[in-house]
């Protein structure tokens, strides 16, 4: 019996030393990367990145899982319930909060990647947006961002003898002077529909006046003097916009067809501006009241919880690889101008410097990147990001509040009080 054990042990040792043993071939690990780039040209870019990674890491295979944006969140839920979540998932900072709340994120793995890349690799303020609610971890590794603000036609303002508006009062003055509803020309295109865009746009003004939906203790703070001032201002500003409920298409079309020389929109208006042929005629500004507040949405790559050790380690390697200068530049430049780099290394690459779109925009990309430290979002207070903000946005209470006082001409004080009550009840349920 002892002898047979020795023979078996010898065989195992021999097998371990011989490269031809079949067990050696089982070192390959396969991981999945879920993202929203369903367009063929974008998938081609990602395929090249994956091929580059696999060449550097011959034991790892990465499979793309492209999912339409509209079906994205549902797909995450479906896959999580069946225990088949991809190891790496592209996600907005908003949805990452939901994933973290459901304990779908491997916080330790995300922290490992951020440690590998270095916190200093990111622009100031970026990592703050992906902080967990308790401020102790991150929900993902940021790869790009878009921001929103006021876009304006330089020639129209110059012809009217008006300067770039720097604060609330100046913006209102410019909008009023350019407003000519009798001729179907309006001072500014603003979202007023019961939509996420309306909440995002209003949030810039509220946060600029130090009004937030939550306070540091996680209590709802909608019915405050600061929020009342912001809502009053937004209502006054909408007196100079197109009548009715305006959403994404109405705002964008009004700016692009000359109906309004100013508009609140994200950097995703830039492809249309470039196509128009004179991008340097368009300026960008974030009007400030008590402080500067720009709405921004970060895209991150997150690593999911519950995977095998070797899969998690492979995912860490892949996301770390994606943050290397040339790789992250290729990712960001799938949407040049519209998607902003959050990793400082991007602007040092030839991919960025030699891009025709970036060249055509002149100093604007640098100006937009310079706004990243000013990103503020509802539900983020200090180093805390309240996950319940997702429930607030999902409820539509804030956008309905704005819609009701602008389009519906409802009483401000009554509307604020009613909205506060609705959110108090909502938070008590969760």
UniProtKB/Swiss-Prot annotation:
Keyword Ribonucleoprotein included in the entry's annotation: no
Signal peptide per UniProt: 1-19
Cellular compartment(s): Periplasm
GO cellular component, one term: ATP-binding cassette (ABC) transporter complex, substrate-binding subunit-containing
Keywords: Periplasm, Signal, Transport
Recorded superkingdom: Bacteria
A family per Pfam: SBP_bac_1
Protein name: Putative ABC transporter periplasmic-binding protein YcjN
Residue ranges the record marks as coiled coil: none
Family named by the database record: Belongs to the bacterial solute-binding protein 1 family.
Tagged with keyword rRNA-binding: no
Major localization class: periplasm
An individual GO BP term: transmembrane transport
Task of the protein: Probably part of the binding-protein-dependent transport system YcjNOP.
InterPro entries: Bact_solute-bd_prot1, SBP
């Amino acid at each position: 019996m002892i002898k047979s054990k020795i023979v078996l042990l010898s065989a195992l040792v021999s097998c371990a030393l011989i490269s031809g043993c079949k067990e050696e071939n089982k070192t390959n690990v396969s991981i999945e990367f879920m993202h929203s780039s369903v367009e063929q040209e974008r998938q081609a870019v990602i395929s090249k990145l994956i091929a580059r990674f696999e060449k550097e890491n011959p034991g790892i295979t990465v499979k793309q899982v492209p999912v339409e944006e509209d079906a994205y969140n549902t797909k995450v839920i479906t896959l999580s319930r069946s225990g088949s979540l991809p190891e790496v998932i592209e996600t907005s900072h908003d949805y990452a909060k939901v994933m973290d709340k459901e304990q779908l994120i491997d916080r330790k793995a995300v922290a490992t990647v951020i440690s590998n890349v270095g916190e200093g690799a990111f622009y100031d303020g970026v990592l703050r947006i992906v902080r967990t609610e308790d401020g102790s971890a991150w929900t993902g590794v940021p790869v790009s961002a878009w921001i929103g603000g006021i876009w304006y036609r330089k020639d129209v303002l110059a012809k009217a003898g008006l300067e770039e508006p720097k604060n609330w009062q100046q913006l209102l003055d410019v909008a009023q002077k350019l407003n000519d509803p009798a001729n179907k020309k309006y001072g500014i295109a603003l979202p007023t529909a019961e939509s996420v865009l309306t909440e995002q746009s209003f949030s810039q003004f509220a946060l600029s006046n130090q009004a937030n939906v939550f306070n540091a203790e996680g209590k709802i703070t909608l019915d405050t003097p600061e929020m009342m001032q912001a809502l009053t201002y937004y209502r006054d500003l909408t007196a100079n916009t197109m009548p009715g409920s305006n959403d994404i298409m109405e705002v964008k079309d009004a700016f692009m067809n000359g109906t309004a020389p100013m508009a609140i929109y994200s950097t995703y208006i830039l492809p249309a501006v470039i196509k128009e042929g004179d991008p340097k005629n368009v300026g960008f500004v974030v009007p400030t009241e008590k402080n500067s507040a720009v709405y921004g949405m970060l895209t991150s790559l997150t690593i999911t919880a519950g995977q095998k050790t070797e899969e998690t380690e492979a995912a860490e390697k892949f996301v770390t690889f994606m943050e290397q200068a040339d790789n992250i530049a290729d990712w960001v430049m799938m949407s040049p101008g519209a998607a902003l780099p959050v990793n400082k290394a991007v602007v040092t690459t030839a991919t960025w410097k030699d891009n025709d779109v970036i060249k055509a925009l002149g100093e604007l990309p640098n100006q937009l990147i310079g706004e990243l430290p000013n990103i503020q979002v509802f539900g983020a207070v200090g180093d805390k990001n309240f996950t319940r903000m997702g429930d607030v946005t999902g409820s539509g209470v804030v956008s309905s509040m704005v819609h009701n006082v602008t389009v519906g001409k409802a009483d401000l004080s009554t509307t604020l009080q009613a909205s506060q009550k609705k959110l108090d009840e909502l938070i008590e349920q969760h």
